[in-house]
């Protein structure tokens, strides 16, 4: 199973997991040479998948942070369907790209920050506070 993680906000980035293992993580500014570059990344995703020897047809799921969809331009113009219930829940969407419809989950922005902190800590239990400069736009 191949999973793409995509963030099109400031410091746009993406990662590729194959069979549960991280095989690539990329930031747009490393390609564009523009500090904190943002927006559309799919052209670069295509190139990096090709360099990793993965066809886009192998992608089973796309995950992204939902905060960018609230009143901002996330650069993910290929999102076909957006459903919002509560801002603290995962949002189920569909992405249409290269003629395929792929399941996509938008995970709350601060939950992404908290999960990274927790999983990088090697602790069984922890308390995590997240706070960033831009807010969540809702």
Per-region residue spans from a language model:
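Short acidic/glycine-rich loops and adjacent helix/strand connectors
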Residues: 1-138
